[in-house]
């Protein structure tokens, strides 16, 4: 249970202050290999380097993920979130409209992979030198 509280705090903090450098540093310090974020439920599945897992259950309302695919909406929504024109909840809803069911962020590869309901890869982005917003 202590790990869940630690990771929840890390994810909450990055949403608040957008300090992604600190976010990645903390994830690496806690031996996170990658995490999977499920847009529909707001759940986060964290996979550690030793293959142990931690689940953070989402507290937000469930959103409906569309079957349409819109990579442009993914990019523009991110830009609007970064400039604080929209909230994380609105960002999440926009990604669901764009057809994103889940994303996987690989900490060591510095990549985020967006997937649809049928597990098709929809979009890939580098997270190395960018300011990103992360779930929770």
Swiss-Prot record:
SUPFAM superfamilies: YdfO-like. Disulfide bonds: none annotated. InterPro entries: DUF1398, YdfO-like_sf. It comes from the Bacteria. To E.coli YcgX and YdfO. Encoded by the cryptic lambdoid prophage DLP12. This is Uncharacterized protein YbcV. It comes from Escherichia coli (strain K12). The gene is ybcV.
């Amino acid at each position: 249970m202590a790990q869940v509280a630690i990771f929840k705090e890390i994810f909450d903090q990055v949403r608040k202050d957008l300090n992604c450098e600190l976010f990645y540093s903390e994830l690496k310090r806690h031996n996170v290999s990658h995490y999977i974020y499920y847009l529909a439920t707001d759940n986060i599945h964290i996979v550690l380097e030793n293959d142990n897992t931690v689940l953070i259950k989402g507290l937000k309302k469930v959103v409906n993920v569309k079957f349409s695919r819109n990579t442009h909406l993914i990019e523009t929504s991110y830009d609007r979130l970064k400039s604080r024109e929209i909230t994380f909840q609105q960002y999440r809803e926009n990604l669901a409209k764009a057809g994103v069911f889940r994303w996987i962020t690989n900490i060591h590869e510095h990549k985020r992979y967006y997937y649809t309901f049928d597990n098709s890869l929809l979009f890939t982005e580098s997270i190395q030198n960018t300011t990103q917003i992360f779930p929770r």
